[in-house]
Amino acid sequence: LEWKRDGWLAGVTWFRNDYRNKIEAGYAPIGQTSTSKVTTDIYQWENVPKAVVEGLEGSLNVPVSDTINWTNNITYMLQSKNKETGDRLSIIPEYTLNSTLSWQVHQDVSLQSTFTWYGKQQPKKYNYKGQPVTGSEKDEVSPYSILGLSATWDVTKNVSLTGGVDNVFDKRQWRAGNAQTTGNTSTGAYMYGAGAYTYNEPGRTWYMSVNTRF
């Protein structure tokens, strides 16, 4: 669905993808490899008989004035799962909102602010052995947001300079390890699972670029 009028735009889209034989890490070991002290199970990628990814996408563009424009889009996940086990297919935000405010200050100067808001992120329900996750393997990433600012100057009709800062408030997200616990029961050496904390969110970053057009 979409509506347009006098520079305004609003829309919403429903999407659904039903999969057969989607590739996913298998749960059943197909063999083992051993050293003098360690025995490790071997797993392989397998086909998921049925899986589904479903959600909503929305957009809203607002012409605040002749020189200011506000654009927004959001994705909300309704489901993303293995239909055989009910487990999540991957670690993705419940929703992602992107908002951009652009101001054409002068014919050759523009300013822009960007805002991204990520929803809750949940890990898989089952580990690589097909058992329910426990302890730190169940850790979720809480919602958080990132703000960016930039300015562009058109030096000539062919050359422009852009400078700005990403992650203005220096929001940090640290990777704590692999999603699930691995280790050896005989030696007691374990690397405990990190749940959804499997990626880094870089801190504040300053940048500058030169762009050319022909």
Identify the meaning behind each predicted range.
Residues 24-44, 133, 181-193:
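Surface-exposed loop/turn segments flanking beta-strands in extracellular/periplasmic regions
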Residues 6-7, 20, 66, 107, ...:
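Short coil turns and loop connectors of transmembrane beta-barrels in diderm outer membranes
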Residues 41-46, 82-88, 133-138, 148, ...:
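Extracellular loop and loop/strand-boundary signature of outer-membrane beta-barrel proteins
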Residues 4-6, 52-54, 91-97, 143-147, ...:
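Residues that define the transmembrane beta-barrel architecture of outer-membrane proteins
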Residues 11-19, 27-30, 35-126, 213:
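Gram-negative outer-membrane beta-barrel transporters
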Residues 117-129, 152-214:
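C-terminal beta-signal and adjacent terminal beta-strands/loops
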Residues 1-3, 58-62, 99-103, 113, ...:
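Residues on the lipid-exposed face of transmembrane beta-strands in outer-membrane beta-barrel proteins
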